[in-house]
Amino acid sequence: MEAMAASTSLPDPGDFDRNVPRICGVCGDRATGFHFNAMTCEGCKGFFRRSMKRKALFTCPFNGDCRITKDNRRHCQACRLKRCVDIGMMKEFILTDEEVQRKREMILKRKEEEALKDSLRPKLSEEQQRIIAILLDAHHKTYDPTYSDFCQFRPPVRVNDGGGSHPSRPNSRHTPSFSGDSSSSCSDHCITSSDMMDSSSFSNLDLSEEDSDDPSVTLELSQLSMLPHLADLVSYSIQKVIGFAKMIPGFRDLTSEDQIVLLKSSAIEVIMLRSNESFTMDDMSWTCGNQDYKYRVSDVTKAGHSLELIEPLIKFQVGLKKLNLHEEEHVLLMAICIVSPDRPGVQDAALIEAIQDRLSNTLQTYIRCRHPPPGSHLLYAKMIQKLADLRSLNEEHSKQYRCLSFQPECSMKLTPLVLEVFGNEIS
């Protein structure tokens, strides 16, 4: 306390532990903070200010060294004032009445400015908050971060140049629910209330495929050891995308035909978007649980895809990862991707555009409200650019899929749902 008394400057508040009770340096009562350059209670603060303003002169009736406590601080004003000076209280810190008034006005003005800024700051409406909550719930219900279902796919087989490797789970079975083998016909309401949708739900849509150039190289079956497993993975992912899409606010208002068109045209794009959650920039791989389900570029090539697709896909995944999207932004981007009015074959483009506009406005408002700078700078524009990148990836995927599916020995390894969504079923 003596060291504090010798100081003529404001002590650093960081030097004091907030958890330690603060004591008035004059009387030992509970202190309320630094007043006039010393830690004091409200009583001694007021006493010092009044004494300095009145230029009061006090005389001690005793020896001039009274011990000042909370109980007797009113008994000897001279020793109390002396104690105030001893601990470092300075009259230069006392504001005049005019200065006090100006300070109060400044504080009031600052509060008013903050209130005005707060009122002008964009806020998510109740409807927008509801949209985000629904999409988050839809994503959580249709995306399993533990990837526990992967063991039910046909097992991954990684054949090396020097010889074959055995599947990690020889007895793993290919579950019908993942392969889309259902033979039931499409109902009037194509998007049903169930979480899963079988491949026949798309059967009413007459697909028009462009004539594809004959593949220049016939793929060897030994080079496609990962095709069965990844076909099951994609089939499973398509079902999850369908489940997510059904919960997008406004999606069920569309006709069954438009729902099918949107799902077929966006499925691979949304799968690529979703896969970013498992993408790791350290080794440019997708890690879905244990090492059996860690997918590298070599695994994708063993499913029949070339670097013309894989290289831009990796670039896309890295760029998307670097945006550090919030989960709310991620689910909104997926929904916007699905509900795109410019997909070929849609009938009610105006209604689809209205739904997408509502989602886009929600995303822009969320970024302004909840995504702090510098990450929010041009974030919406960057996210829309990612959708454009996905269109290019989709186009390249379609080319490579057609090359693959025109080979009967390859198409046999695909699931009915994959065949139905990505192109005409090969007979």
From Swiss-Prot:
Region of interest called Interaction with coactivator LXXLL motif, as start-end residue ranges on this chain: 246-264
Its job: Nuclear receptor for calcitriol, the active form of vitamin D3 which mediates the action of this vitamin on cells. Enters the nucleus upon vitamin D3 binding where it forms heterodimers with the retinoid X receptor/RXR. The VDR-RXR heterodimers bind to specific response elements on DNA and activate the transcription of vitamin D3-responsive target genes. Plays a central role in calcium homeostasis. Also functions as a receptor for the secondary bile acid lithocholic acid (LCA) and its metabolites.
Family annotation (SUPFAM superfamilies): Glucocorticoid receptor-like (DNA-binding domain), Nuclear receptor ligand-binding domain
InterPro entries noted in UniProt: DBD_VDR, NHR-like_dom_sf, Nucl_hrmn_rcpt_lig-bd, Nuclear_hormone_rcpt_NR1, Nuclear_hrmn_rcpt, VitD_rcpt, Znf_hrmn_rcpt, Znf_NHR/GATA
Zinc fingers classed as NR C4-type: ranges: 24-44, 60-84
Binding site residues for Zn(2+) 2: 60, 66, 76, 79
Subunit structure: Homodimer in the absence of bound vitamin D3. Heterodimer with RXRA after vitamin D3 binding. Interacts with MED1, NCOA1, NCOA2, NCOA3 and NCOA6 coactivators, leading to a strong increase of transcription of target genes. Interacts with the corepressor NCOR1. Interacts with SNW1. Interacts with IRX4, the interaction does not affect its transactivation activity. Interacts with CRY1. Interacts with CRY2 in a ligand-dependent manner.
NR LBD domain location: 127-423
Biased composition (Low complexity): 177-190
Consequence of changing residue 360 to P: In VDDR2A; loss of calcitriol receptor activity; loss of affinity for calcitriol; decreased ligand-independent localization to the nucleus; loss of interaction with RXRA; loss of interaction with NCOR1; loss of interaction with NCOA1; loss of sequence-specific DNA-binding
Post-translational modification: Ubiquitinated by UBR5, leading to its degradation: UBR5 specifically recognizes and binds ligand-bound VDR when it is not associated with coactivators (NCOAs). In presence of NCOAs, the UBR5-degron is not accessible, preventing its ubiquitination and degradation.
Region annotated Hinge, chain positions: 97-126
Recorded consequence of changing residue 305 to Q: In VDDR2A; loss of calcitriol receptor activity; no effect on interaction with RXRA; changed interaction with NCOR1; loss of interaction with NCOA1; no effect on sequence-specific DNA-binding
Domain comment quoted from the record: Composed of three domains: a modulating N-terminal domain, a DNA-binding domain and a C-terminal ligand-binding domain. The 9aaTAD motif is a transactivation domain present in a large number of yeast and animal transcription factors.
Gene Ontology terms, MF aspect: bile acid nuclear receptor activity; calcitriol binding; DNA binding; DNA-binding transcription factor activity, RNA polymerase II-specific; lithocholic acid binding; nuclear receptor activity; nuclear retinoid X receptor binding; nuclear steroid receptor activity
GO CC terms of this entry: chromatin; cytosol; nucleoplasm; nucleus; receptor complex; RNA polymerase II transcription regulator complex
Record localization: Nucleus; Cytoplasm
Predominant localisation class: nucleus
Protein name, per record: Vitamin D3 receptor
Known disease link: Rickets vitamin D-dependent 2A: A disorder of vitamin D metabolism resulting in severe rickets, hypocalcemia and secondary hyperparathyroidism. Most patients have total alopecia in addition to rickets.
